[in-house]
Amino acid sequence: MTQHDRLLIIDFGSQVTQLIARRLRELNVYCEIHPYQNVTEAFLKGFAPKAVIFSGGPSSVFAEGAPMPPACVFEMGVPILGICYGQQVMMHCLGGKVERGHGTAEFGRAFVTPAEGRLAILDGWFEDGREQVWMSHGDHVSQIAPGFQVFGTSPNAPFAITADPARHFYAVQFHPEVHHTPKGAKLYENFVKLAGFKGDWTMGAYREEAIAKIRAQVGDQKVICGLSGGVDSSVAAVLIHEAIGDQLTCVFVDHGLLRLGEAEQVVTMFRDHYNMPLIHADESDLFLGALEGVSDPEVKRKTIGRLFIDVFQKHAADVGGATFLAQGTLYPDVIESVSFSGGPSVTIKSHHNVGGLPEKMGLKLVEPLRELFKDEVRALGRELGLPDSFIGRHPFPGPGLAIRCPGEITREKLEILRQADAVYIDQIRRHGLYDEIWQAFVALLPVRTVGVMGDGRTYDYACALRAVTSVDGMTADYYPFTHEFLGETATRIINEVQGINRVTYDITSKPPGTIEWE
């Protein structure tokens, strides 16, 4: 199996550390994020990075117990890039000086101008005399460490870009990973080129290596996979099936809360097209019965999550002799489980997942996607031959339409919601907008309104259209449809869907709102 060169990102707590990894993965460089407290001398020997990046972070080098890397990292003889707090750490550790931010803090857009000398990591920069960057710092470097030179300055950061070219140590006070630093990607490209990375970490290579790993892990044992019809579980299932064939059985739990025709699409694709052993468990009566009279969104989510585990266990037992459970865990999930802070956070919404299943069922985990980001999963899906129409689908929540139907759920409401959602998505596709939007759906509101159709009075439901743009789902903006589009869509829904006589458009961003209504 090919051994790829690895880049280590030491995380000091920045909110945008994952973006560093994303930028490097886009360059076909394999990298991992590890919190600073886990990076010991023994870890570094085992990981053997070809280069290291220090992330930014909210701390001050003056704080008691301030996050620091092990001293031996500077003796490894590999290129190091320090970003924001990472720059301050480098200067602090190597003999420079950092001062507290009194009137010199910079937050937001700034412009860096070049200093004397040429630096290979800045190839392609300063062609127009200065570069826009994104700053977010309180403290600042006041004296650079021995061996370092200044290669770029900003009004409040005289050492915005510094380097010790002989040791291949580079440090910047800004964040090259964010889109607000337009040439940040070029800086990363130059850094990995200087470090000697070949850019050989592709989805084609990942596919071959993942298949070999799955075969080595599973042997001749049986694997069960909870198939939701979403991108993650689908790509995991196709990859595992390619590795071990009919040793894999998928269990598709239909809770009666799916979109129009969705269950049939999943069964057709995986049973008929991919010829996978598939148990289609239609448990809609069980789920809808348990949700009868329930209006609290947290109770809805927890009821669905509990029943899902019960149903999955029951049908998985029918497989008999399974040793492994496959899950579509992604790299952001892994990062968060070993996060910088490890501290508790407020539960905004309970997540519907099968996290408790392995312990309950005594199964070992197969997680073939745990090294990938979402966009890489989609690329792997294309590599595996899944159709773009499936790979490019918008995210769909585990509890399904239950959380797009605020208030009590009934079969009648669900059918109205399915029909309205199908019309809305059809409109978006007809206008060529689907791929511009992160997520779009209809929420059926627990409100009836008076209307007039023909010569008669109506008293039907109102619905809300939702469409947002986002990069990762953590923040989102509403999509700016034209009034013509909204008017045309509202007319179609009211004319084609019996039970709705009023259509609204939700223009709330996240934050303060969430993408889903519940």
UniProtKB/Swiss-Prot annotation:
This is GMP synthase [glutamine-hydrolyzing]. GO terms for molecular function: ATP binding; GMP synthase activity. ATP binds at S228, G229, G230, V231, D232, S233, S234. It catalyses: XMP + L-glutamine + ATP + H2O = GMP + L-glutamate + AMP + diphosphate + 2 H(+). Homodimer. The gene is guaA. It comes from the Bacteria. Its EC number is 6.3.5.2. It comes from Cereibacter sphaeroides (strain ATCC 17025 / ATH 2.4.3).
